[in-house]
């Protein structure tokens, strides 16, 4: 180099060789105020902050090595004589101009950047500018302790092309990498005025540092970037996230002449000073940019860079795009990067430049961020919206290019198409292992092999698929531990082929129209796979290795035209495949009867196999929650049983008062863990059908075609407290019980003699004429009403056929609106009027008059008298049936008719 004279001040060797760790802070009047922060270049602005002292590196960032001698040696500056250089004060770099002097009064510029050593500089003069000399130390008096991390992109080739070298992090490095430049930001005005190679390289290096600097803010404040506070760009985040478009804050404003760059190992592109030499906006594309140069829109105003609080990595800054030195796979993908713009707005090439269509979105980052607000790092795709057919119904129509998977539920019948298993397989089959020979094809229960037939289609041959499915209570799917095995030989009549569909072996056969689209499945066996292989390969733990029951599943795709098919599927009965079960487990193939009264006692015959002399038959009932509610063992008749037949007596059901059929199950057990599959059975409620007494001439209930009793019958009650019936010639009929214990409408007949004397709560309707019909009133014919008790000699008692519950609603219509006749009962009249209001129905204590409630009026005497005499809790249906049979036992036949047999 040239002369080593310095006219500013003498050289301090302690600072040059790094012997002094920290310099005392400068006072207000120190030399740190010589450089105005407003007029200083961006690199000088960086030096005015408060750097982190050595030894106080944040967690997660490698501590830089200690300073070495020569690390802080001052860079040279141009001397007055051409071609010579002289030393600068520490931490200041002067780029000489045409009128530069040793005293710094010329037109040179002073640049002060941390960890930068200028080994050589281009002699091209700078534009004439004026700037004061830089201070000796940084604004806070701290030494320059910010070398870049090791290996930070330092793979640029050494040596200079065109006579220029560049900055290096240490004196021993001669790399030309602009990655090692450790500045913070670039000033737009300074970069616009600078036209030499050094300024262009400085612009590139400054933007590179601003995008990937690992240093946090020593002031821990996420304040916006200002020239007075350059390190606040990298303050820790307080929870908010800065816009990702802040990577453009270091871009240059206008075209600057580019300089040739040396070739790089990885085909790294050459950047110009006309724009930000970085990848495309992270809000638009995840990809890096290694293309050619192109025009770029002006950058937006500077936006803050905030450190990502959720990451501990040294390069995780929100708003900083990944650089090419960081592999693509290791970059943190934010929500803005994950959600790309429409395809038409994406960059057309990987050149790092934004397309013209996205300039507005980049210029207005707030709008783009507002659209993406509330998202996390990765954009979760919207859930797959199933069609209506998937949600319910499972439409079996598919495209030929997208057939349904094997676990897709399919019906066995669709419109006129039906896939039917004509002959079911046997309930057990000995599956063979991979290490042993074949056990043969699956047999059918009556003999032979299963038969499958397709109904509703007979146009051309179709392919029938068969696989082994599950037989548990869950949806049908391929079994993990069993698969179909192809049987071959000269005794096999059906040709088959093996195929693998989604990891499941499928046997394919042909349905021919000449065979009526039927196939005899004599070519299919069952192979047991090794448990360890399946559990390790598929992770099948929900099915379990003890699940040894399977089904034969058949599937066919019927073409429909237009590139679509209809898929139908049929599954066989469960097949037990375990070795022990084939020998010891009982199997029930048929039983009769399938229903019985709750009283039990009937004989049940089971047909099957593997029945033993000590086999047991157990009836069980489970509740809706699956818990056992009832269990009873049936008595087996050993004398009438064999290995294939069991005869037993059906036990009595636990609840005999049920009003509807009850579904229960039974199974055959040969001992512990040797049970047959459960079979369904029904218990029916008891039908009350009492036989009449021996002295009774009435074998059933009277009909409604005529009067049921003679004129001289006495129905006085022989045994209180049961009600009495009328004697003499009644013009009414006794109501009788129908199914559901309802009441039929009583028929009325005209009076032919004096009115009878009776004590009863019976109700009757008048007849409108004739002796054969029972015409009813137009609107109230279904409402029974009693005659006044005082006119017929006595007070009414309780209705003999009353029940603890009220009769059905159709038998209680509203009361008639017409007033009653003055003569309530006239022998010469053919019409019997309705009783008067306020009639004492069941006694003097009950008068449903004007003040009575509607419930009492509509209920009449059905429930009130019954509740007065017989307690509700103390009567059963059997007692009601007994009362009915006893009181109706003396009813004779109609006059002129034979008594019923």
From Swiss-Prot:
Q: Could you tell me which residues belong to the region Calcineurin-binding?
A: 114-119
Q: What keyword terms does UniProt attach to this protein?
A: Activator, Cytoplasm, Developmental protein, Differentiation, DNA-binding, Isopeptide bond, Nucleus, Phosphoprotein, Repeat, Transcription, Transcription regulation, Ubl conjugation
Please describe the organ and tissue distribution of this protein's expression: Expressed in heart (at protein level).
Give the subcellular location. Answer: Cytoplasm; Nucleus
> May I ask which residue range the UniProt record assigns to the signal sequence?
none
> Which spans does this entry mark as compositional bias, Pro residues?
61-81, 215-227, 254-263, 805-822
Q: Where is the RHD domain?
A: 401-582
Q: According to the UniProt entry, which residues carry Phosphoserine?
A: 168, 170, 213, 217, 289, 334, 344
**Region 2 approximate SP repeats, annotated ranges:** 213-293
- In chain numbering, motif Nuclear localization signal lies across 268-270, 672-674
What kind of modification does the protein receive after translation?
A: Phosphorylated by NFATC-kinases; dephosphorylated by calcineurin/PPP3CA. Phosphorylated on Ser-168 and Ser-170 by MTOR, IRAK1, MAPK7/ERK5 and MAPK14/p38, on Ser-213 and Ser-217 by MAPK8 and MAPK9, and on Ser-289 and Ser-344 by RPS6KA3. Phosphorylated by GSK3B; this phosphorylation markedly increases NFATC4 ubiquitination. Phosphorylation by MAPK8/JNK1, MAPK9/JNK2 and RPS6KA3 may stimulate NFATC4 transcriptional activity. Phosphorylation at Ser-168 and Ser-170 is stimulated by UV irradiation.
Subunit structure of this chain's protein: Member of the multicomponent NFATC transcription complex that consists of at least two components, a pre-existing cytoplasmic component NFATC2 and an inducible nuclear component NFATC1. Other NFAT proteins, such as NFATC4, NFATC3, or members of the activating protein-1 (AP-1) family and MAF can also bind the complex. NFAT proteins can bind DNA as monomers or dimers. Component of a promoter-binding complex composed of STAT3, NFATC3 and NFATC4; complex formation is enhanced by calcineurin. Interacts with CREBBP; this interaction potentiates transcription activation.
What is this protein's name?
Nuclear factor of activated T-cells, cytoplasmic 4
């Amino acid at each position: 180099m040239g002369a080593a004279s310095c006219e500013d001040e003498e050289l301090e060797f302690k600072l040059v060789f790094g012997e002094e760790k920290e310099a005392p802070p400068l006072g207000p009047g120190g030399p740190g105020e010589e450089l105005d922060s407003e007029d200083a270049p961006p690199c000088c602005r960086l030096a005015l902050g408060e750097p982190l002292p050595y030894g106080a590196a944040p967690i997660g960032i490698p501590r830089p090595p200690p300073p070495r001698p020569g690390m802080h040696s001052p860079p040279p500056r141009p001397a007055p004589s051409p071609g010579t250089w002289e030393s600068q004060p520490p931490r200041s770099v002067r780029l000489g101009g045409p009128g530069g002097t040793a005293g710094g009064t010329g037109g040179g510029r002073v640049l002060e950047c941390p960890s930068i050593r200028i080994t050589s500089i281009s002699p091209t003069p700078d534009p004439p500018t004026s700037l004061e000399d830089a201070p000796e130390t940084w604004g806070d008096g701290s030494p320059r302790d910010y070398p870049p991390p090791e290996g930070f992109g330092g793979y640029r080739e050494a040596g200079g092309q065109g006579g220029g070298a560049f900055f290096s992090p240490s004196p021993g490095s001669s790399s030309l990498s602009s990655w090692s430049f450790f500045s913070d930001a670039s000033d737009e005005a300074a970069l616009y005025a600078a036209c030499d190679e050094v300024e262009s390289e400085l612009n590139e290096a400054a933007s590179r540092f601003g995008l990937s600097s690992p240093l946090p803010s020593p002031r821990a404040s996420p304040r916006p970037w200002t020239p007075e506070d350059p390190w606040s760009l990298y303050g820790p985040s307080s929870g908010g996230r800065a816009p990702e478009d802040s990577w453009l804050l270091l871009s240059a404003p206008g075209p600057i002449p580019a300089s040739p760059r040396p070739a790089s190992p990885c085909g790294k592109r050459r950047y110009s000073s006309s724009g930000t030499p970085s990848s495309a906006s992270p809000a638009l594309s995840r990809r890096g940019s290694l293309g050619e140069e192109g025009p770029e829109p002006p950058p937006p105003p500077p936006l803050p860079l905030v450190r990502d609080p959720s990451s501990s990595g040294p390069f995780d800054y929100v708003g900083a795009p990944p650089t090419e030195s960081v592999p693509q796979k290791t970059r943190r993908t934010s929500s803005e990067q994950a959600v790309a713009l429409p395809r038409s707005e994406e960059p057309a090439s990987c050149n790092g430049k934004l397309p013209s269509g996205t300039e507005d979105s980049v210029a207005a980052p707030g709008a783009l961020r507002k659209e993406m607000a509330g998202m996390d790092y990765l954009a979760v795709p919207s859930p797959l919206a199933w069609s209506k057919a998937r949600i319910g119904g499972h439409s079996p129509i598919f495209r030929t290019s997208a057939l349904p998977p094997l676990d897709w539920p399919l019906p066995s019948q669709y419109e006129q198409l039906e896939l039917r298993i004509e002959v079911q397989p046997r309930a057990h089959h000995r599956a063979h292992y991979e290490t042993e020979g074949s056990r043969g094809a699956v047999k059918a229960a009556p003999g032979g092999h299963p038969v499958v037939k397709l109904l509703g289609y007979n146009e051309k041959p179709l392919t029938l698929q068969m696989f082994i499915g599950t037989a548990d209570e869950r949806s049908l799917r391929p079994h993990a531990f069993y698969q179909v095995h192809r049987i071959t030989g000269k005794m096999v009549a059906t040709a088959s082929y093996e195929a693998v569909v989604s990891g499941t072996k499928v046997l394919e056969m042909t349905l021919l129209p000449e065979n009526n689209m039927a196939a005899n499945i004599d070519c299919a066996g069952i192979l047991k796979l090794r448990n360890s292989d399946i559990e390790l390969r598929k992770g099948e733990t929900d099915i379990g290795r003890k699940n040894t029951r399977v089904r034969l599943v058949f599937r066919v795709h019927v073409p429909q035209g237009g590139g679509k098919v209809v898929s139908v599927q049929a599954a066989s009965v469960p097949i037990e495949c375990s070795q022990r079960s084939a020998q010891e487990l009982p199997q029930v193939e048929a039983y009769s009867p399938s229903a019985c009264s709750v009283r039990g006692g009937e004989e049940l015959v089971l047909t099957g196999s593997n029945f033993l002399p000590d086999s047991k038959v157990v009836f069980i009932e489970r509740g809706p929650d699956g818990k056992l509610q009832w269990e009873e063992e049936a008595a087996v008749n050993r004398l009438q049983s064999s290995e294939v037949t069991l005869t037993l007596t059906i036990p009595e059901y636990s609840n005999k008062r049920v009003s509807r059929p009850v579904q229960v199950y039974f199974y055959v057990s040969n001992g512990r863990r040797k049970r047959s599959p459960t079979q369904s059975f029904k218990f029916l409620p008891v039908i009350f059908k009492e036989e009449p007494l021996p002295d009774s001439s009435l074998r059933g209930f009277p009909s409604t075609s005529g009067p049921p009793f003679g004129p001289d019958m006495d129905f006085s009650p022989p045994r209180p407290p049961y009600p009495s019936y009328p004697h003499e010639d009644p013009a009414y009929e006794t109501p009788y019980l129908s199914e559901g214990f309802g009441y039929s409408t009583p028929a009325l007949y005209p009076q032919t003699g004096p009115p009878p004397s009776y004590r009863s709560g019976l109700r009757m309707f008048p007849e409108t004429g004739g002796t054969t019909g029972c015409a009813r009133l137009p609107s109230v014919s279904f409402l029974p009403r009693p005659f006044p008790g005082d006119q017929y000699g006595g007070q009414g008692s309780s209705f003999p056929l009353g029940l603890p519950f009220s009769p059905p609603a159709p038998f209680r219509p509203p009361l008639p609106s017409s007033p009653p006749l003055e003569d309530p009962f006239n022998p010469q009249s053919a019409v019997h009027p309705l009783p008067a209001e306020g009639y004492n129905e069941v006694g003097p204590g009950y008068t449903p008059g004007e003040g009575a409630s509607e419930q009492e009026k509509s209920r009449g005497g059905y429930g009130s008298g019954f509740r007065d005499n017989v307690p509700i809790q103390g009567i059963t249906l059997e007692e009601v049936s007994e009362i009915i049979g006893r009181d109706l036992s003396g009813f004779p036949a109609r006059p002129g008719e034979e008594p019923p047999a």
